């Protein structure tokens, strides 16, 4: 299974398009999607991105909670209702929906952050601050 690896920063053009890193596009296309699925992170100031097979895993996990459980309804509405399937143009660019851009505080650049089976999209300044905080926490744990 191919994974989303590394971090890239790409600029949003005047038409609102951003180029998805080619290595990320390759992983998404290997999973049968000429685009990506995105939704607001439920816990971070970022956008979660993934392939269709990851959404199927999420769906399976939610369904295991039972068809009428409150947990299922809450999680389904917070993930599936706010998800967008976004297709690549000929140059591998996408237009990220405005509500997702706003939820992540993205302005004119996007940090694409590989997370293994998924990836995140951040405002680069926000990601840098979060990344620095995580680095400091790891240093504290080592010593």
Model-derived segments and their meaning:
Residues 57, 63-94, 100:
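Short, solvent-exposed interaction modules
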């Amino acid at each position: 299974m191919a994974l989303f690896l590394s971090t890239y920063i790409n600029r949003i053009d005047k038409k609102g398009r951003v180029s998805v890193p080619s290595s990320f596009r390759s992983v998404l296309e290997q999973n049968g999607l000429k685009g990506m699925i995105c939704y607001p992170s439920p816990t971070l100031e970022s956008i979660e991105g993934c392939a269709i097979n990851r959404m199927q895993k999420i769906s399976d996990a939610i369904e295991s909670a039972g068809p009428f459980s409150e947990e299922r309804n809450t999680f389904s509405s917070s993930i599936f209702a706010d998800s967008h399937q976004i297709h690549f143009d000929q140059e591998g660019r996408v237009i990220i929906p405005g509500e997702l851009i706003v939820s992540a505080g993205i302005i004119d650049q996007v940090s694409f952050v590989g997370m293994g089976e998924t990836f995140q999209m951040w405002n680069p300044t926000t990601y840098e601050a979060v990344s620095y905080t995580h680095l400091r926490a790891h240093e504290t744990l080592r010593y």
